[in-house]
């Protein structure tokens, strides 16, 4: 099946899930492994700093006096499959 990389900033994961759903719905694929990874690099940190979004103080995201943002790295993947009623009894949802 198709293999592609999508880089549309914050919307990348939404785009790959929508694309995978469309391929499955149209019958072009029975399943799709989709995922997203976000890593921090110097240019990202410099960009947020240039926008004055990085606080000089520690970030307190749940504080009424909060400022700045919390940047982090993450990865997530999911297997999307065609819904087949005959297979429902044997499907086991697993995750970490």
Please give the residue ranges for each predicted region.
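Active-site-proximal alpha-helical scaffold in enzymes
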Residues: 3-36, 71-87
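Glycine/charged-rich beta-loop-alpha catalytic/anionic-binding loops adjacent to active sites
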Residues: 1-6, 55-63
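Condensing-enzyme catalytic core mediating Claisen C-C bond formation in acyl metabolism
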Residues: 58-96
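Acyl-CoA/ACP chain-elongation machinery
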Residues: 28-50, 55-59, 66, 96
């Amino acid at each position: 099946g198709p293999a592609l990389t999508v880089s549309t900033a914050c919307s990348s994961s939404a785009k790959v899930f929508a694309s995978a759903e469309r391929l499955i719905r149209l019958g072009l694929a029975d399943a799709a492994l989709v995922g997203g990874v976000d890593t921090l690099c110097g240019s990202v940190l410099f960009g947020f700093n240039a926008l004055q979004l990085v606080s000089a103080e520690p970030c307190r995201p749940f504080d009424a006096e909060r400022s700045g943002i919390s940047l982090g790295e993450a990865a997530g993947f999911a297997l999307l499959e065609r819904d087949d009623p005959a297979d429902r009894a044997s499907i086991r949802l697993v995750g970490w």
